[in-house]
Amino acid sequence: IGYLKLLKKNGVKRVVLTSSMVALMGGKKTGTIIPEDWTDLNSKNISTYFKSKTLAERAAWDFINNQSGGQSLELVTINPGGVFGPPLGDNLSGASMSMMVKFLGGKIPMVPNASFPMVDVRDVAYLHVAALTKTKAANQRFIATEKIGRSFQSICQLLIDNGYKGPSTKVAPNFMLKFLSIFDR
């Protein structure tokens, strides 16, 4: 919030915040996700990562919605799914790239029986530019992902089909994932 205050004080008109799909979908079991959705922070199965992304974006919107004095700062949030594509450099530490590196290196012996919403990094970049330049984008949230997520198993199979040896297509039993989720609080 300190950055938003500083930007407003210095006359910046609009800020584009990269949030995440996890700020919209946590706690939702089925159905379509829309920009008005928010992760249910009271849901018992929400990870700390989901909570942190949701709280950060909510704080930004609270600041925007409670501004007083001077020109109002506009906010646009981009909520991407897993972001994949060519990296800018050698740093592969982002959440999506780290996961892919683990798949490629055979570090994940089993995959969850779940789907994963994905988006190309170049599409996310385009959305950021549009969010800054399009008048209608002011004070809106934009979901950046394909309509239907891909299963982790199909992602790994695609990697195998393209010559990678590390990925596993073995699906982890749901009970194992539920047990392991206890430690992600």
What are these regions (language model features)?
Residues 1-47, 68-69:
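Conserved Rossmann-fold NAD(P)-dependent oxidoreductase catalytic core, especially the SDR/UDP-sugar
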Residues 9, 43-76:
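Active-site Tyr-X1-5-Lys
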Residues 19, 79-80, 84:
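Conserved SDR Rossmann-fold cofactor-binding beta-strand/turn motif
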Residues 40-45, 89-90, 97-119:
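A conserved pocket-lining segment of Rossmann-fold NAD(P)-dependent short-chain dehydrogenase/reductase
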Residues 51, 77, 112-125, 141, ...:
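Conserved loop-to-helix N-cap of the C-terminal "lid" that shapes the substrate pocket in Rossmann-like
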Residues 69-71, 85-98, 131-142:
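Glycine/proline-rich active-site loop of Rossmann-fold NAD(P)-dependent oxidoreductases
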Residues 127-185:
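Mid/C-terminal beta-alpha module of Rossmann-like enzyme folds, strongest
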